[in-house]
């Protein structure tokens, strides 16, 4: 809540991915830049994608929805949408800089509000369509473009002990993110 309400609303600092690009292009290290560097770029080297499960405010809201376990397997082809979102956010902020738009701080604040509204509405819509609370995380979240490559080198990650695994599939049935631990 601190990052979402205090930094985002009261301090008017965009904590979404667009805010990260904005402050990075400015060459300033505001809270958004530091947050992305620690939690989403270098943090996954230690904790994997722990951010998603324990600290993401979008996932927190989506976890109140009734679909704790996905009803169907993940639709792998839709995962490309997260990279489209990632590139769109980069392109949008880049365009604002290249066009030398005035009042960029005010625009970034409204982008923060609109971005969060879009994330929550699309997350709820996807959850209802796919009957999966974390459908937004799996298919649309642009932050995973940072998290995914770094988490491959993570020190802390879920592993399957092949000597004890009976390949019953129960772990996959109860995992909200469809993580296939035995692969």
Language model features: what each stretch is:
Residues 1-182:
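Non-ligating segments of multi-cofactor redox enzymes
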């Amino acid at each position: 809540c601190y990052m979402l309400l205090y930094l985002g609303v009261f301090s008017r600092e965009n904590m979404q991915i667009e805010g990260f690009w904005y402050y990075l292009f400015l060459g300033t290290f505001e809270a958004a830049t530091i947050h992305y560097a620690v939690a989403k770029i270098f943090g996954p080297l230690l904790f994997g994608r722990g951010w998603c499960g324990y600290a993401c405010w979008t996932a927190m809201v989506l976890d109140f929805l009734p679909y704790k376990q996905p009803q169907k397997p993940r639709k792998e082809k839709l995962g490309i949408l997260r990279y489209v979102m990632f590139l769109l956010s980069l392109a949008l902020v880049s365009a604002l800089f290249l066009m030398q738009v005035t009042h960029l701080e005010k625009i970034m604040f409204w982008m923060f509000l609109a971005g969060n509204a879009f994330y929550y509405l699309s997350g709820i819509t996807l959850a209802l369509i796919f009957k999966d609370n974390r459908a937004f995380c799996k298919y649309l979240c642009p932050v995973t473009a940072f998290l995914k490559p770094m988490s491959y080198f993570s020190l802390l990650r879920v592993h399957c002990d092949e000597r004890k695994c009976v390949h019953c599939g129960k772990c996959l049935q109860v995992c909200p993110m469809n993580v296939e631990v035995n692969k």
